[in-house]
């Protein structure tokens, strides 16, 4: 009896080809996962160091001046901590939150590889929130650092303090730079996430 199927046409191969093609769209490849994993590890390291450096920033120095009451030369010991500034405290809290989120998202992205595509949108939204959090805290901390470096006599009557507490200002500025690098890493993560969403569609 003559076969009803056309020669050379294999139904199973055709279905398998379509399934394989569909699987390529849904399942993320290791080449697309690796940059995201590396960037999250970088963000973990940078935010951790930033929070520790900023939180531990303090300096004790001896200030010499003339007593206004006695008109005599006097010396006092002054200790300044980063936690005296609300902006610096906000910086530490923000970096700690981003650090914990980075750890959790890294674990989820490595454990649930099969469901990584379905989690791309939540990850992208959360990553964008981390970008906003980092940039806002970095901006607040940088503004206070500028005042500490240059003073603000015209509006608030604040004197500059970095000429007396140079070590404190150096550590604060280093923490801000590291946190800015972490925010750049998250910007790249958001771009990768949007690209993966577009590719999956």
UniProtKB/Swiss-Prot annotation:
The keyword Membrane applies. InterPro entries: CASP/CASPL, CASP_dom, CASPL. It holds the Pfam family CASP_dom. It comes from the Eukaryota. Keywords: Cell membrane, Membrane, Transmembrane, Transmembrane helix. It is found in: Cell membrane. Residues 58-87, 149-173 are extracellular. The chain crosses the membrane at residues 37-57, 88-108, 128-148, 174-194. Disulfide bonds: none annotated. Residues 1-36, 109-127, 195-201 are cytoplasmic. It is a multi-pass membrane protein. GO terms for cellular component: plasma membrane. Homodimer and heterodimers. Belongs to the Casparian strip membrane proteins (CASP) family. PANTHER family: CASP-LIKE PROTEIN 1U1. This is CASP-like protein 1E1. It comes from Musa acuminata (Banana).
């Amino acid at each position: 009896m003559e076969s009803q199927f056309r020669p050379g046409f294999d139904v199973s191969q055709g279905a398998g080809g379509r399934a394989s093609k569909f699987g390529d769209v849904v399942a993320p490849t290791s080449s697309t996962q690796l940059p995201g994993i590396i960037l999250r590890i970088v963000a973990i390291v940078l935010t951790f160091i930033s929070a520790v450096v900023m939180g531990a920033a303090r300096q004790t120095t001896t200030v010499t001046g003339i007593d206004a009451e006695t008109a005599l030369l006097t010396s006092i010991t002054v200790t300044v901590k980063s936690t005296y500034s609300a902006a610096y405290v906000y910086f530490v809290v923000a970096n700690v939150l981003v650090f914990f989120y980075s750890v959790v998202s890294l674990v989820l992205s490595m454990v649930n590889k099969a469901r990584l595509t379905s989690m791309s949108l939540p990850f992208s939204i959360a990553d964008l929130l981390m970008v906003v959090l980092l940039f806002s805290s970095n901006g607040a901390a940088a503004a206070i650092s500028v005042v500490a470096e240059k003073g603000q006599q015209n509006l608030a009557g604040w004197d500059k303090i970095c000429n007396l507490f140079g070590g404190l200002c150096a550590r604060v500025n280093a923490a801000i730079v590291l946190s800015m690098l972490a925010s750049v890493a998250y910007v790249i993560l958001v771009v990768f996430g949007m690209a993966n969403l577009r590719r999956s569609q």
